[in-house]
Regions:
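Bulky hydrophobic segments
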Residues: 1-141, 152, 161
């Protein structure tokens, strides 16, 4: 039978856990960049757009956690749609929304000022997320799955009994 093999629940769970762990690392990097970037003397460009890049990578990974059966390309499309909606929502100025944007959580989640350059940073961040997801998937396949296949090949080779 040709075609895609059915995805096992344990593999989906493992993929989601890896993506969640990566998302936590990306969040820590993003917060560190925002809080310590200027005191460390990093250029404003790096702090601003590096944070946007990491935000989009986080969105990609979290969409992957929530929808593990989707392909990385499908996850990227959804993450890009979320990023575009969030960026263009900055053009909407309702009092309650502007008040939320003034909070730390609002600034980190939604941002404050519309910028087309953010869309470029988001695209790069999503591409980075696809790349990272692929590297982790190949690492997991090379490191985790072969244990089971080696065991099965050893069992198959021990039929001399």
């Amino acid at each position: 039978m040709h075609g895609a093999q059915p995805v096992k629940p344990n593999a989906l769970r493992q993929k989601s856990l890896i993506r969640a762990a990566l998302a936590l690392v990306v969040i820590a990097c993003g917060l560190s960049l925002r809080w310590y970037g200027f005191p460390l003397g990093l250029p404003a460009f790096v702090v601003k757009y590096g944070g946007s890049l990491l935000w989009a990578t986080m969105v990609f990974l979290l969409v992957g956690v929530l929808l593990p059966r989707l392909s990385p390309m499908q996850i990227a499309i959804i993450a890009a749609a979320i990023a575009i909606v969030v960026e263009f929502s900055r053009l909407i100025h309702a009092p309650w929304l502007d008040a939320f944007r003034l909070t730390t959580a609002g600034a980190l989640l939604l941002g404050r000022i519309f910028s087309l350059w953010n869309l470029v940073a988001y695209l790069i961040g999503i591409v980075a997320g696809v790349w990272l997801d692929g590297r982790v998937a190949s690492f997991a396949q090379d490191r985790i799955l072969p244990r089971h296949s080696k065991l099965n090949s050893q069992q198959a080779g021990s039929t001399r009994e």
